[in-house]
């Protein structure tokens, strides 16, 4: 119970039954449980799924019924404003993937499709502009005074990659009993021994997606975690 990431599988595992190098913990989504039950009752595999169409560019945000691996090109006909450049994401903005080309299909674990604006505009002297209409995790912009305001987020990174600076923001985003700044730093430099000792084996990409979103240095911690986990698997 609580705000994101309280509902993530990784958060539940951490507090109930954390995995480690000698223990594997499995999870299953509620729609897959329904499909398994239907298989036992009828003998037929139910591949239908209920997903949401969401995001600032969605004309009619709602729930729809579709099938596993459905073509998003077909699903999203007339679903977004074509006068705006749109990025289609299979999954959430935090842990989904850009669905285009050969990947323009519903992901195996995606429960939503997100439509956001492709934005590469640069703001002149943005670092000293009060920016009352731009969201920030840290209260450094004028928008911090708009407690109940909703923001239409885009693909704009609002900056470039730079050195990682420990600001204390990661500690406010991760509910697990970790040292997040030290863990994320070990992932960046591929120090898998330190990463394991700090709890990397309990995580997957979505568990640290908020850190990627809030990082002032613009690092992709999800891909760094995956690279470290693959290295750990290969080296033992």
Feature-to-residue mapping (PLM):
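Buried, small/hydrophobic-residue-enriched core segments of structured protein domains
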Residues: 1-74, 78-236
